């Protein structure tokens, strides 16, 4: 056994230390994989939260546009175009939010993350409001269509008095709008109503799928129990019914 320069003897490494280093090197990839998996799950959760929030914003915008439609007594093509654009984007974002939420929800009888429960409830409420606002917009456009047809059948005469140079008697000129001026606009409004009806069916089907895929503790609740939520996740056991929910609605 050789002596060290400072007078101490070099001790050989023990077998225990060698084996411990080997275990540590084996665990490092597992820890890195676990950390990366947690990061991916967090990114997926953040993406889902962002998508649901975007859909929430679009529903609020669509509601404001429907209110504006109701405040106008005449048809406004530019407002209808904005409402159509918002509605189409809202349907696409709703589908994306559903797919993102299903991807992170996990098994029905596993541990339920409170944030996932909150997103399920938020998306359900947004879809219900979205369908309601689309129904309102369809009814309002229908009323405008009936109002337009009534005006077409009984147009108000817009008389303009002009003087004929060859006569001393003033002549009345009818400048009322002809019913032939409106068919194109009328057809566009009818097409908008049909598109809204189609989008409503799509969103109703999506709402049905969302309710079917919700975590079981959420399925077993009525609407009044949504106000009594516990802040901790629960693990559902098979063939057992929970009396309370397992998430916070407010973020």
Curated annotation (Swiss-Prot):
Q: What is the lineage of its organism?
A: Eukaryota, Metazoa, Chordata, Craniata, Vertebrata
Family membership noted in the UniProt record? Belongs to the RGS7BP/RGS9BP family.
Question: Which ranges are annotated Basic and acidic residues under compositional bias?
Answer: 25-43
This protein's superkingdom? Answer: Eukaryota
Which PANTHER family does its entry note?
Answer: R-SEVEN BINDING PROTEIN (R7BP) HOMOLOG
Please tell me whether the keyword Membrane is annotated for this protein: yes
- Membrane disposition: Lipid-anchor
**Name of the featured protein:** Regulator of G-protein signaling 7-binding protein B
Q: Which UniProt keywords apply?
A: Cell membrane, Cytoplasm, Lipoprotein, Membrane, Nucleus, Palmitate, Signal transduction inhibitor
Q: Which GO terms describe its cellular component?
A: cytoplasm; neuron projection; nucleus; plasma membrane; postsynapse
Output the GO biological process annotations, alphabetical, semicolon-separated.
G protein-coupled receptor signaling pathway; negative regulation of signal transduction
User: Where does it mainly reside?
Assistant: nucleus
- State the residue spans of region: Disordered: 1-43
Locate the lipid attachment (S-palmitoyl cysteine).
246-247
UniProt keyword Lipoprotein, yes or no: yes
The record describes the protein's role as:
Regulator of G protein-coupled receptor (GPCR) signaling. Regulatory subunit of the R7-Gbeta5 complexes that acts by controlling the subcellular location of the R7-Gbeta5 complexes. When palmitoylated, it targets the R7-Gbeta5 complexes to the plasma membrane, leading to inhibit G protein alpha subunits. When it is unpalmitoylated, the R7-Gbeta5 complexes undergo a nuclear/cytoplasmic shuttling.
Q: Reproduce the UniProt comment on modification after translation.
A: Palmitoylated. Undergoes rapid palmitoylation turnover. Palmitoylation regulates the cell membrane and nuclear shuttling and the regulation of GPCR signaling. Upon depalmitoylation, it is targeted from the plasma membrane into the nucleus. GPCR signaling inhibits depalmitoylation and promotes localization to the plasma membrane.
Q: Where in the cell is it found?
A: Nucleus; Cytoplasm; Cell membrane
> InterPro entries annotated for this entry?
RGS7BP/RGS9BP (IPR026512)
């Amino acid at each position: 056994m050789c002596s060290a320069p400072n007078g101490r003897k070099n001790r050989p490494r023990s077998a225990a230390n060698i084996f411990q280093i080997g275990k540590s090197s084996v665990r490092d990839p597992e820890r890195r994989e676990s950390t990366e998996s947690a990061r991916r799950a967090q990114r997926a959760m953040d993406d889902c939260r962002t998508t649901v929030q975007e859909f929430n914003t679009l529903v609020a915008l669509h509601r404001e546009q429907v209110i504006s439609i109701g405040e106008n007594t005449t048809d406004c093509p530019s407002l209808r175009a904005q409402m159509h654009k918002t509605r189409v984007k809202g349907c696409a974002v709703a589908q994306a939010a559903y797919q993102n939420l299903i991807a992170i929800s996990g098994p029905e009888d596993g541990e339920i993350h409170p944030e996932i429960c909150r997103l399920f409830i938020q998306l359900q409420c947004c879809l219900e409001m979205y369908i309601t606002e689309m129904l309102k917009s369809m009814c309002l456009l229908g009323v405008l269509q009936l109002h337009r047809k009534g005006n077409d059948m009984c147009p108000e005469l817009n008389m303009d008095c002009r003087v004929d140079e060859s006569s001393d008697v003033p002549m009345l000129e009818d400048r009322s709008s002809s019913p032939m001026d409106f068919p194109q606009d009328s057809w566009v409004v009818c097409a908008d109503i049909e598109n809204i009806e189609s989008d409503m069916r799509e969103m109703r089907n999506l709402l049905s799928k969302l309710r079917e895929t919700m975590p079981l503790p959420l399925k077993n609740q009525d609407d009044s129990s949504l106000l009594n939520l516990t802040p901790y996740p629960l693990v559902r056991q098979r063939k057992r019914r929970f009396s309370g929910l397992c998430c916070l609605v407010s973020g």
